[in-house]
């Protein structure tokens, strides 16, 4: 039997992960990114950008449920949601499950990513691109949040790692723009890497976001594809109470929503804000 081709991730220099490639479905460089989608027996279809795994069919539900349901249920009455990035459609899929949301705007820098994922990762979007509440904007995320006349209750930054095109979504200019178009008591969330390996990302985000929001923190989830420990998600708002809602309040909102999830539940919601001591110490040691 011929040995299977292996795809190696290049996120870290000294160690990493690899996937056996059963079948390459798509591989092409777009104007902005090097995109590959392939099949793996353990994780299903895998998408990688610029040598870094972005999503897999097997475990994407953890990431997308936590990025959407935590801020939306904490907010309690979000009507207008902005997604920055998210071209694979799974973030959109989870937001559309909230029937009280009236509009969902998604800003993606690369139209090619959307078309590729719609064809090759259909389970990610699950038809959500056809939701009448959805609007796609092809634009740079920093430009959009600093120019739009729209305002939003929840902003979800489904950004890549802070390298290449994704770097701009970790800048003060982006955070300032998000504050600009976020409604009072609105919530901003963003992926912030695996904190054991990428601690500086969390520290940098905390420092920058604190210039614009009165309550800045993180919550976490364990996602197998993003190896190295827990993944952290940045959280920023001017309503300090939203990060500290009781499990009972979240439970009532969860039941009213009719959601049925595979990872998220109200107990996970409140527990997710408990951070390991090494991250708490790192954040506390930074100058205010």
From Swiss-Prot:
Keywords tagged on the record: Cytoplasm, Polyamine biosynthesis, Spermidine biosynthesis, Transferase
Primary location: cytoplasm
GO molecular function: spermidine synthase activity
A GO biological process held by the record: spermidine biosynthetic process
Cell location: Cytoplasm
Assigned EC number: 2.5.1.16
Reactions that this protein is recorded to catalyse: S-adenosyl 3-(methylsulfanyl)propylamine + putrescine = S-methyl-5'-thioadenosine + spermidine + H(+)
Amino-acid positions noted as binding spermidine in the UniProt annotation, renumbered to this chain: 64, 88, 158-161
Domain PABS: start-end pairs: 9-238
GO cellular component: cytosol
Pfam families in the cross-refs: Spermine_synt_N, Spermine_synth
Positions contributing to S-methyl-5'-thioadenosine binding: 33, 108, 140-141, 165
Positions of the catalytic residues: 158
Pathway given in the UniProt record: Amine and polyamine biosynthesis; spermidine biosynthesis; spermidine from putrescine: step 1/1
Subunit structure and binding partners: Homodimer or homotetramer.
Physiological role: Catalyzes the irreversible transfer of a propylamine group from the amino donor S-adenosylmethioninamine (decarboxy-AdoMet) to putrescine (1,4-diaminobutane) to yield spermidine.
Family: Belongs to the spermidine/spermine synthase family.
UniProt name for this protein: Polyamine aminopropyltransferase
Species annotation: Escherichia coli O81 (strain ED1a)
